[in-house]
Amino acid sequence: AGFAGDDAPRAVFPSIVGRPRHQGVMVGMGQKDAYVGDEAQSKRGILTLKYPIEHGIVSNWDDMEKIWHHTFYNELRVAPEEHPVLLTEAPLNPKANREKMTQIMFETFNVPAMYVAIQAVLSLYASGRTTGIVLDSGDGVSHTVPIYEGYALPHAILRLDLAGRGLTDYLMKILTERGYMFTTSAEREIVRDVKEKLAYVALDFEQELETAKSSSSVEKSYELPDGQVITIGAERFRCPEVLFQPSFIGMEAAGIHETTYNSIMKSDVDIRKDLYGNIVLSGGSTMFPGIADRMSKEITALAPSSMKIKVVAPPERKYSVWIGGSILASLSTFQQ
């Protein structure tokens, strides 16, 4: 969250709401009935954490309202009734959801005006394009969204219910095979950090496995909060490989490369060339080193042999949805 015209968000925090597991023993300890974002994260030991956004779509409106309240009053410190608001939504977000979001903004927060934009379209704007296909992969869901002249093509949008959370779960599982047990919601956050700091995508998975078996070049160490040091090897690239091979976690779904290809094939034949040449990665789960090269390699193998393929991975892509929103909302044409 932040202000239109800024080049980076003012506030970045996880969309989590935590509630105390046990009622406060001592009265007047100032224990709140709910904690949001980083505060929920840091007090996770005594809380039950809930994610009001599932697979990119809001499923718990009371908690979502708490998150918005926290955003306006604690993070941005603005009076929402004084500012028009741009919100974003997942592609193919149900109409009822958009209406509910609008209702809360106008009735609870009294905003003067609002607009809801599709996340992937904003990412494309942020990359300086109006035509291309965006692979947006965040925490709960990945989408491939073909966009032509600024408009998403709904019939060709594909959704994959696999993203950051699934990768963290898988890393927890394969670290268990090494004898490192991570089970609680507090420990899952540690594993998420391991993933973000050490995981990478192999250009050739099988070959990388051989390398990992025969040498220690892949191994890295990580210090846990309690000072214990763990060593992680092949897990580093086995974790994000799930994006390309969802069968690793028992999902009968096409990987991100194949989903992107299928999305292009669902688009009008006349614009496919423009899509192949403008494949834009967006979202935190596209931040793995090596992902763009691998994506390029896989799409090249699927596409017609003469096709020019370009995969773009902007360095700021973790926040490119927000940046695109900042650009859009600061246009004078948009404000009217």
Swiss-Prot record:
One term of GO molecular function: hydrolase activity
Catalytic activity: ATP + H2O = ADP + phosphate + H(+)
CDD domains registered for this protein in UniProt: ASKHA_NBD_actin
Entry EC number(s): 3.6.4.-
Regions annotated as coiled coil: none
Predominant subcellular localization, coarse grouping: cytoplasm
Broad EC category: hydrolase
Localization annotation: Cytoplasm, Cytoskeleton
Keyword terms of this UniProt record: ATP-binding, Cytoplasm, Cytoskeleton, Hydrolase, Nucleotide-binding
Record flagged with keyword ATP-binding: yes
InterPro entries in alphabetical order: Actin, Actin/actin-like_CS, Actin_CS, ATPase_NBD
GO CC annotations, alphabetized: actin cytoskeleton; cytoplasm
Domain of life: Eukaryota
PANTHER family, alphabetized: ACTIN (PTHR11937)
Family, similarity comment: Belongs to the actin family.
Described function: Actins are highly conserved proteins that are involved in various types of cell motility and are ubiquitously expressed in all eukaryotic cells. Essential component of cell cytoskeleton; plays an important role in cytoplasmic streaming, cell shape determination, cell division, organelle movement and extension growth.
Misc remark: There are at least 7 different actin genes in tobacco.
Protein name per the record: Actin-104
Native source species: Nicotiana tabacum
